[in-house]
């Protein structure tokens, strides 16, 4: 099988014409172009620069190093598309304030066609009538504060059940528990319950859900794989599959869609039997969307069923993966900073006590816990480069001319560790957020863990509710130490997201009365 680079080289002669057409300018811009990193080749651009360079750090770290060399605004080419990387307050504000509407489109990636319901998923859809209508539905009917309030008891019950499960795993003073796996199970089970009304437990769930979990992990891998068409978006290359990724995408999508289709049919049948509003039957997210969405096409050629399944998939991706990832980093930071952990425990003991568990209504009084969550999101934002944007027309960023069709990476990780904006930027210090009004809403352009502007994350409120409540329970309920009494390894994995290479494995001990578990 040909490697990605061999495939490119073999087809390079077919791309010269398209390359020159792609890069041709009708007139010279009045503003200068941003700095471009050296080493680019004709046609393929800087693909070699990021291809197996022996650096296994996250892409955000690599791009951060380039910003140190070439400045907080620079460009490079991944094949034909031009990529703009920004990491300064001024440039980020230009992109998500002044030019917010211009940068509201999404670049086309092949996985969006084959895995993302032909880009019907909310985070993949281009800015336009379909996206606006679907986002409005999600924000007002599915992820609104009032709707999430109705699911408050579901979140609490699920977290309580998982805490009890964690307690039963304690075996003396030497049993090591994989907290990373526990967090993944908790968040996956919680979102499945809220979306489809299903109770899922590892090893006890139905076969379909287990198959979906496998397909979900395959999606995460395939969506980050290099595909020829992504670098050379030419119709001919859409059907070239030297690497076998398209075949794998189709197979994975089939497994994912079969689960969502089954859930959808169950809910449609339930509605037909008029069981949705029967006493004792709660409305989950699919019930809500079915009640609000007509059976008509919603634009862009999507059917109602496709939109529902695509929306469900978007919610699962955000809730099951990024939330667990963030809490995992948060607990690792606390274990390595025992003074902060002790202070958080003392705050909960004082404000809540030790004779009941923290509830969502308590969070507003737990100021130090809120500061911890903010600081974890500063150091390890769930989307360190955000989802890529693309400008629909020429614009100006930090005084530079940015041609139409440029792909935008906002290096949030670099921005939120900028020593010009943050003191001791690489140090875990929740105190920095105690006497400040900086929040998560994306209006403080030095702190945008959930993005900013029109394309900011619609699931932010849900994510913060789960993160605060889960971390509060873990802080309140247990004491922790590492198996070797050494600090946890904080090595970051390669790729677009920031995953901890090694799981958080701990020896835990309860700190509340046994009857509370």
Swiss-Prot record:
<keyword id="KW-0503">Monooxygenase</keyword>
<dbReference type="GO" id="GO:0020037">
    <property type="term" value="F:heme binding"/>
</dbReference>
<feature type="cross-link" description="Glycyl lysine isopeptide (Lys-Gly) (interchain with G-Cter in ubiquitin)">
    <location>
        <position position="254"/>
    </location>
</feature>
<keyword id="KW-1133">Transmembrane helix</keyword>
<feature type="binding site" description="axial binding residue">
    <location>
        <position position="457"/>
    </location>
    <ligand>
        <name>heme</name>
    </ligand>
</feature>
<keyword id="KW-0832">Ubl conjugation</keyword>
<keyword id="KW-0472">Membrane</keyword>
<keyword id="KW-0560">Oxidoreductase</keyword>
<comment type="similarity">
    <text>Belongs to the cytochrome P450 family. CYP82E2 subfamily.</text>
</comment>
<dbReference type="GO" id="GO:0009820">
    <property type="term" value="P:alkaloid metabolic process"/>
</dbReference>
<dbReference type="InterPro" id="IPR036396">
    <property type="entry name" value="Cyt_P450_sf"/>
</dbReference>
<protein>
    <recommendedName>
        <fullName>Nicotine N-demethylase CYP82E4</fullName>
        <ecNumber>1.14.14.-</ecNumber>
    </recommendedName>
</protein>
<dbReference type="InterPro" id="IPR017972">
    <property type="entry name" value="Cyt_P450_CS"/>
</dbReference>
<feature type="transmembrane region" description="Helical">
    <location>
        <begin position="2"/>
        <end position="22"/>
    </location>
</feature>
<comment type="function">
    <text>Involved in the biosynthesis of pyridine alkaloid natural products, leading mainly to the production of anabasine, anatabine, nicotine and nornicotine, effective deterrents against herbivores with antiparasitic and pesticide properties (neurotoxins); nornicotine serves as the precursor in the synthesis of the carcinogen compound N'-nitrosonornicotine (NNN). Catalyzes the demethylation of nicotine to form nornicotine.</text>
</comment>
<keyword id="KW-0017">Alkaloid metabolism</keyword>
<keyword id="KW-0349">Heme</keyword>
<dbReference type="InterPro" id="IPR001128">
    <property type="entry name" value="Cyt_P450"/>
</dbReference>
<dbReference type="GO" id="GO:0016705">
    <property type="term" value="F:oxidoreductase activity, acting on paired donors, with incorporation or reduction of molecular oxygen"/>
</dbReference>
<keyword id="KW-0408">Iron</keyword>
<dbReference type="GO" id="GO:0004497">
    <property type="term" value="F:monooxygenase activity"/>
</dbReference>
<dbReference type="InterPro" id="IPR050651">
    <property type="entry name" value="Plant_Cytochrome_P450_Monoox"/>
</dbReference>
<dbReference type="Pfam" id="PF00067">
    <property type="entry name" value="p450"/>
</dbReference>
<keyword id="KW-0479">Metal-binding</keyword>
<dbReference type="GO" id="GO:0016020">
    <property type="term" value="C:membrane"/>
</dbReference>
<dbReference type="InterPro" id="IPR002401">
    <property type="entry name" value="Cyt_P450_E_grp-I"/>
</dbReference>
<keyword id="KW-1017">Isopeptide bond</keyword>
<comment type="pathway">
    <text>Alkaloid biosynthesis; nicotine biosynthesis.</text>
</comment>
<dbReference type="GO" id="GO:0005506">
    <property type="term" value="F:iron ion binding"/>
</dbReference>
<dbReference type="GO" id="GO:0042179">
    <property type="term" value="P:nicotine biosynthetic process"/>
</dbReference>
<keyword id="KW-0812">Transmembrane</keyword>
């Amino acid at each position: 099988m040909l490697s990605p680079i061999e495939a490119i080289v073999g087809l390079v002669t077919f791309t010269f014409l398209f390359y020159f057409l792609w890069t041709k300018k009708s007139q010279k811009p009045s503003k200068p172009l941003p700095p471009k990193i050296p080493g680019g080749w004709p046609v393929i651009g800087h693909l070699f620069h990021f291809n197996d360079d022996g650096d296994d750090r996250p892409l955000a770290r690599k791009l951060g190093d380039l910003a140190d060399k070439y400045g907080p605004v620079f460009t490079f080419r991944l094949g034909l598309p031009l990529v703009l990387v920004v990491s300064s307050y001024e440039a980020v504000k230009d992109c998500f304030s002044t030019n917010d509407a211009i940068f509201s489109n999404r670049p086309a990636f092949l996985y969006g066609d084959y895995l993302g319901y032909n880009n019907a998923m909310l985070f993949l859809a281009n800015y336009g009538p379909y996206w606006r209508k679907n986002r409005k539905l999600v924000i007002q009917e599915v992820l609104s504060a009032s709707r999430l309030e109705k699911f408050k008891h579901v979140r609490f019950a699920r977290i309580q059940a998982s805490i009890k499960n964690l307690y039963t795993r304690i075996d003396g003073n030497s049993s090591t528990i994989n907290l990373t796996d526990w967090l993944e199970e908790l968040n996956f089970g919680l979102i499945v319950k809220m979306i489809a009304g299903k109770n899922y437990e590892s090893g006890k769930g139905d076969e379909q859900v287990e198959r979906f979990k496998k397909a979900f992990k395959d999606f995460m891998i395939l969506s980050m794989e290099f595909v020829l068409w992504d670098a050379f978006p030419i119709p001919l290359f859409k059907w070239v599959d030297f690497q076998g990724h398209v075949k794998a995408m189709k197979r994975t999508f089939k497994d994912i869609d079969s689960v969502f289709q089954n859930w959808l049919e169950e809910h449609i049948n339930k509605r037909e039997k008029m069981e949705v509003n029967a006493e004792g039957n709660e409305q989950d997210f699919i019930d809500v969307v079915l009640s609000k969405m007509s059976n008509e096409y919603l634009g862009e050629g999507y059917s109602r069923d496709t939109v529902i399944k695509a929306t469900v998939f978007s919610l699962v991706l955000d809730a099951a993966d990024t939330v667990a990832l963030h809490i995992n980093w948060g607990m690792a930071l606390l274990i390595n900073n025992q003074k902060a952990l002790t202070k958080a425990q003392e705050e909960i003991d004082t404000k809540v006590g030790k004779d009941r568990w923290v509830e969502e209504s308590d969070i507003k009084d737990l100021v130090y816990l809120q500061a911890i969550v903010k600081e974890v999101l500063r150091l390890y934002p769930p989307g360190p480069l955000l989802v890529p944007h693309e400008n629909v027309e020429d614009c100006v960023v930090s005084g530079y001319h940015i041609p139409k069709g440029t792909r935008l990476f906002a290096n949030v990780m670099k921005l939120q560790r900028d020593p010009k904006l943050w003191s001791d930027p690489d140090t875990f210090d929740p105190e920095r957020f105690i006497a400040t009004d900086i929040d998560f809403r994306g209006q403080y352009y030095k702190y945008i863990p959930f993005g900013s502007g029109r394309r900011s994350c619609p699931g932010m409120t849900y994510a913060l509710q789960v993160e605060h409540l889960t971390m509060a329970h873990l802080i309140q309920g247990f004491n922790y130490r590492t198996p070797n009494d050494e600090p946890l390894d904080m090595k970051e994995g390669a790729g677009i997201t920031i995953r901890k290479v090694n799981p958080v494995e701990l020896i835990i001990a309860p700190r509340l009365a046994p009857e509370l578990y």
